[in-house]
């Protein structure tokens, strides 16, 4: 089950003790990226998406239709 990911517990593939995350656009070096870090750049008339600082996921900005 070990994916070879250094953030991943080899048995459960959940974050190792003391680490925040295993993977995701807002996860780097096993830690969440700071709130306000751009995780998806805007295209056209869209707006940037930003990390929350508490999740490895990149949430959609609330203004997307």
From Swiss-Prot:
What InterPro entries would the database entry show? Disintegrin_CS (IPR018358), Disintegrin_dom (IPR001762), Disintegrin_dom_sf (IPR036436)
Q: Where in the cell is it found?
A: Secreted
Gene3D superfamilies from the entry? Disintegrin domain (4.10.70.10)
Q: Name one GO molecular function term.
A: toxin activity
| Tissue specificity | Expressed by the venom gland.
User: What would be one Gene Ontology cellular-component term for the protein?
Assistant: extracellular region
Q: Which Pfam families match?
A: Disintegrin
Q: Please report the stretch or stretches of sequence annotated as the Disintegrin domain.
A: 1-65
Q: List the disulfide bonds.
A: 7-30, 21-27, 26-51, 39-58
Q: Where is this motif: Cell attachment site?
A: 43-45
| Record key words, sorted | Cell adhesion impairing toxin, Disulfide bond, Hemostasis impairing toxin, Platelet aggregation inhibiting toxin, Secreted, Toxin
- Subunit annotation: Homodimer; disulfide-linked.
Q: What does this protein do?
A: Poor inhibitor of platelet aggregation. The disintegrin inhibits the adhesion of cells expressing the RGD-dependent integrin alpha-5/beta-1 (ITGA5/ITGB1) to immobilized fibronectin. Inhibition on alpha-2b/beta-3 (ITGA2B/ITGB3) is low.
Misc note: Does no inhibit alpha-1/beta-1 (ITGA1/ITGB1), alpha-2/beta-1 (ITGA2/ITGB1) and alpha-6/beta-1 (ITGA6/ITGB1).
Similarity-based family:
Belongs to the disintegrin family. Dimeric disintegrin subfamily.
Question: Could you identify this protein by its name?
Answer: Disintegrin VLO4
